Amino acid sequence: ASQTDPRDIVGQAFDSLVFGDHPYGSSLDGTIESVTALTRDDILAAHQGALARDRLYVSAVGDITEAELAALLDSLLGDLPESGAPLPGNVAPNLPGGVKVADFATPQSIVAFAQPGIDRDDPDFFAAYILNHILGGGGFESRLMSEVREKRGLTYGVYSYLADKDAAQLWMGSVASANDRVAEAITVIRDEWDRIHTEGVTPEELENAKTYLTG
């Protein structure tokens, strides 16, 4: 299915371009060749390498003390190895600008777009989160939806989001549009991306976003 679904095709083309030989650049589903070549030993080794105490997160809520929880975890997870297989390091996304096309016979084009993002631990992360809500993360209230869909009818949906991965950060989004109008959609998105960079947001937009996000 991933070889015939336009969204999967553009997603894989995007990951390959942006992340190259890093694991983020390969398909989550593998390839026909790589999956066919898997053995039982490969599966066991992957399982043993992934489940280890150095990458385990546990949360607990309820009538239990720290000591009781520690004893329970030791009994349940004590046999796990202390450390697992080495994790891939950070990767600097390759974002040279421009447009790359993955040819596929379909009446509608799917577009993925991105720029460098921001780490969740960055002190400006929540400001960026609000900014993204105004630009493309706020559904019908967002600028992208207003300009690309409501005013011009170029798409049924367009959005952006902060993609804070463990090894890389992106600010990215997607839009689907008819082949004969997708170039216009891309131009409008670029213009709005630039406008929010140069002009910022209005006091009303900021207040509305903060009110929505805080309930």
Language-model regions, residue ranges each:
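Charge-rich, well-structured scaffold segments of protease-associated domains
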Residues: 1-84, 101, 127, 151-152, ...
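His/Glu-based metal-binding/catalytic segments typifying zinc-dependent metallopeptidases
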Residues: 16, 85-141
